[in-house]
């Protein structure tokens, strides 16, 4: 299980600004492993978790494939074998 800082926190740090919040992507983990490590799932249909102490957001790495027209026409894969 590896954790990578992503999103606005990375941008802010590159600009020399202290990030207000930090979001993380998790590689090499399953939903069950996250729960077993004390993370709290916050999304019903998406593996996004909150760290119990820091309250920072952690999302499992994913791949997406366009399958249909429109905003919802995607197939999403959350395998622990997805890399960045």
From Swiss-Prot:
User: What broad taxonomic lineage does this protein's source fall under?
Assistant: Bacteria, Pseudomonadati, Pseudomonadota, Gammaproteobacteria, Thiotrichales
Q: Which InterPro entries match?
A: NT_sf, PolA_pol_head_dom, tRNA_CCA-adding_enzyme
| Residues reported to bind Mg(2+) | 21, 23
| Source organism of the structure | Francisella novicida
- MF terms in GO: ATP binding; CCA tRNA nucleotidyltransferase activity; metal ion binding; RNA binding
Record-level GO BP terms: tRNA processing
Q: By what name is this protein known?
A: CCA tRNA nucleotidyltransferase
Gene encoding this chain? cca
The cross-references to PANTHER family, in alphabetical order and at most eight, read:
MULTIFUNCTIONAL CCA PROTEIN
Q: Which reaction does it catalyse?
A: a tRNA precursor + 2 CTP + ATP = a tRNA with a 3' CCA end + 3 diphosphate; a tRNA with a 3' CCA end + 2 CTP + ATP = a tRNA with a 3' CCACCA end + 3 diphosphate
Is Secreted set as a keyword in this record?
no
């Amino acid at each position: 299980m590896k954790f990578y800082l992503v999103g606005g926190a990375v941008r802010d740090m590159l600009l020399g600004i202290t990030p207000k919040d930090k979001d993380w992507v998790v590689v090499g983990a399953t939903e069950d492993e996250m729960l077993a490590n004390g993370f709290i799932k916050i999304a019903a249909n998406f593996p996004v978790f909150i760290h119990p102490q820091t309250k920072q957001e952690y999302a499992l790495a994913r791949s997406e494939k366009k399958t249909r027209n429109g905003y919802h026409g995607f197939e999403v894969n959350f395998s622990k074998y997805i890399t960045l």
